C-alpha cells in the first residue's frame, strides 16, 4: 500500500467510478487551477496497484512553505481506505514542503428535508477519522466562511423525466415556473467572446449583495478548461415580442369574458359563472397593467433582446452543479432564474446525470435565507458537509510565522 502520484487519465478513470463527486475533483478543474498559478498533482492511495483513494492536491507558496489543499475530496469507493490515505498524506505533505495542509471532504455529514429538518443521524465517524490522526477541525459552521458554504441544496433526478419535471417542483414552484415561461423568455449559451455579458451580470449582483466576484479572466479560463461540461447561460426578453404576446393572451381572455357575459344574460343567478367573470375581469385588468409596463420597457430598450439573468452550470457524470449566477433587479418580475433552473434540470435529465446540486445555502432555517427560499421551489433536500480540516507538519513554525505576520499587520 502506497501513496503515489498518478496520471490525469488514471485519475479520471477512477473518478468516473465513484458514486459521489464534485466538479472540483475533475481533470477540468485541475487544468483551471494550474492555469491560475497552482501546482497540481493527481495523487492516489493504491493497494496491489489498484487505486483505492484519489484526489487532486493543489499547492500555492506561502510564507514558510506551501499551502496544500484537497477541496471536495478525496474520492473513494471504500470508506475503510480513508484512514491510511489521510495518515500517509500527512507524511507526504511534510516531505514536500507544506506548512499547511487543508482538506475539505465531500462526504455528507447529515441530510435534512427541504425545510431543514434532519432526516439522518450525524455521521461523526468521518470527522473522528481525521481528528484522531491529528487534523484540526474548523468546526461545524453556517453561512459562507471563506466564501464556501458547507450546506448544499440538492435534488435527486433519477426517475424524473422531461414530462414530469414540472410536477416534481413544490406547490409554489410549479406556478412560478409556469408564469416565468409565459413571458417569452429566451435562453442562450454564451460563446467565449461573449463572456463579458456574463461578467456584467455577476458584477452587478456582487455589488448589490456585497461579495467578491470572479474576474473576467477567471470565467474565460473556466470556459477553456471545462468546454462542453459547462454552460454559461443567459436569459433574455424582447419587449416587443412580450407586448405582442400580452395582447394575444388578453384577446383570448376577452373572448372568454364575452362568452361568460352572454351566459349570464341567460342565467344571471349562476354563482359559478359570476365568480369566473370576476376572476377573468381581474386578470384582464392585470394584462392592462403589464401592457403599460411593457410599453415603458419598449421606450427604453426598443427591439433589442434584453438580458435579464445569467447562470453558470457544470456537468459531471455524478452530478450537475449550479455554480455562479446573477440577475438585474429591474427585471425581477419576470422570474428569469426559474427558467434557467428548469433548463438546467432538463439538461441534467438529457445527459443522464442522477443528481442536481444547487450548491450553497446558509444552513439557517428561520426564514431569513432568500437563496434557500428560491431553491425550495424545486423541491429538493439539504446536505451538510463536514467543513474544513487542517494539519500543520511543523506547528511551532506555523505559529511563529502567524505571530510575526500578526505583529507586522499582515494577518
Region roles according to the model:
Residues 69-71, 313:
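Catalytic phosphate/metal-binding cores of nucleic-acid and nucleotide-processing enzymes, i.e., regions
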Residues 78-79, 116-123, 166, 212, ...:
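Flexible, glycine- and charge-enriched loops at secondary-structure boundaries
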Residues 80-91, 332-346:
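Conserved acetyl-CoA-binding loop-helix of GNAT-fold acetyltransferases
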Residues 71-80, 158, 325-334, 362:
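A short, internal acetyl-CoA/4′-phosphopantetheine-binding micro-motif in the GNAT/acyltransferase core
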Residues 96-114, 350-360:
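Conserved GNAT acetyl-CoA-binding A-motif
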Residues 3-64, 113, 135-146, 156-331:
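A conserved beta-strand-loop-helix scaffold within acyl/acetyltransferase catalytic domains
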Residues 220-223, 311, 345, 372, ...:
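Generic hydrophobic alpha-helical scaffold/packing signal
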Residues 5-8, 18, 31-32, 119-160, ...:
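Active-site/acyl-donor-binding loops of N-acyltransferases
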Amino acid at each position: 500500500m502506497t501513496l503515489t502520484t498518478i496520471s490525469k487519465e488514471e485519475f479520471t478513470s477512477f473518478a468516473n467510478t465513484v458514486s459521489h463527486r464534485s466538479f472540483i475533483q475533475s481533470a477540468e478543474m485541475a487544468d483551471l487551477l494550474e492555469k491560475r498559478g497552482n501546482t497540481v498533482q493527481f495523487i492516489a492511495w493504491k493497494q496491489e496497484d489498484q487505486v483505492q483513494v484519489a484526489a487532486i492536491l493543489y499547492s500555492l507558496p506561502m510564507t514558510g512553505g506551501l499551502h496544500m489543499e484537497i477541496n471536495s475530496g478525496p474520492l473513494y469507493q471504500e470508506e475503510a481506505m480513508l484512514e491510511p490515505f489521510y495518515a500517509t498524506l500527512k507524511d507526504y505533505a511534510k516531505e514536500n514542503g507544506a506548512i499547511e495542509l487543508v482538506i475539505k471532504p465531500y462526504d455528507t455529514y447529515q441530510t435534512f428535508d427541504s425545510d431543514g429538518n434532519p432526516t439522518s443521524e450525524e455521521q461523526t465517524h468521518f470527522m473522528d477519522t481525521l481528528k484522531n490522526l491529528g487534523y484540526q477541525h474548523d468546526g461545524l459552521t453556517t453561512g459562507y466562511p471563506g466564501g464556501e458554504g458547507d450546506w448544499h441544496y440538492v435534488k435527486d433526478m433519477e426517475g424524473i423525466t422531461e414530462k414530469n419535471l414540472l410536477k416534481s417542483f413544490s406547490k409554489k414552484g410549479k406556478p412560478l415556473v409556469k408564469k416565468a415561461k409565459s413571458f417569452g423568455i429566451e435562453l442562450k449559451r454564451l460563446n467565449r467572446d461573449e463572456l463579458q455579458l456574463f461578467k456584467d451580470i455577476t458584477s452587478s449582483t456582487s455589488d448589490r449583495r456585497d461579495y467578491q466576484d470572479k474576474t473576467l479572466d477567471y470565467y474565460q479560463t473556466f470556459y477553456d478548461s471545462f468546454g462542453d461540461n459547462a454552460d454559461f447561460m443567459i436569459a433574455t426578453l424582447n419587449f416587443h415580442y412580450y407586448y405582442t404576446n400580452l395582447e394575444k393572451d388578453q384577446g383570448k381572455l376577452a373572448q372568454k369574458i364575452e362568452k361568460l357575459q352572454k351566459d349570464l344574460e341567460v342565467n344571471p343567478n349562476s354563482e359559478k359563472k359570476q365568480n369566473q367573470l370576476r376572476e377573468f375581469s381581474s386578470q384582464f385588468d392585470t394584462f392592462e397593467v403589464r401592457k403599460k409596463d411593457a410599453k415603458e420597457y419598449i421606450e427604453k430598450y426598443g427591439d433589442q433582446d434584453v438580458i435579464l439573468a445569467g447562470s453558470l452550470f457544470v456537468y459531471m457524470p455524478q452530478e450537475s452543479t449550479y455554480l455562479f449566477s446573477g440577475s438585474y433587479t429591474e427585471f425581477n418580475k419576470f422570474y428569469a432564474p426559474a427558467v434557467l433552473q428548469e433548463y438546467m434540470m432538463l439538461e441534467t435529465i438529457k445527459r443522464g446525470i442522477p443528481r442536481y446540486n444547487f450548491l450553497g445555502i446558509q444552513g439557517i432555517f428561520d426564514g431569513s435565507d432568500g437563496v434557500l427560499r428560491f431553491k425550495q421551489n424545486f423541491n429538493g433536500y439539504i446536505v451538510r458537509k463536514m467543513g474544513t480540516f487542517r494539519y500543520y507538519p511543523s506547528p511551532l513554525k506555523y505559529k511563529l510565522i502567524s505571530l510575526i505576520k500578526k505583529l507586522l499587520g499582515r494577518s
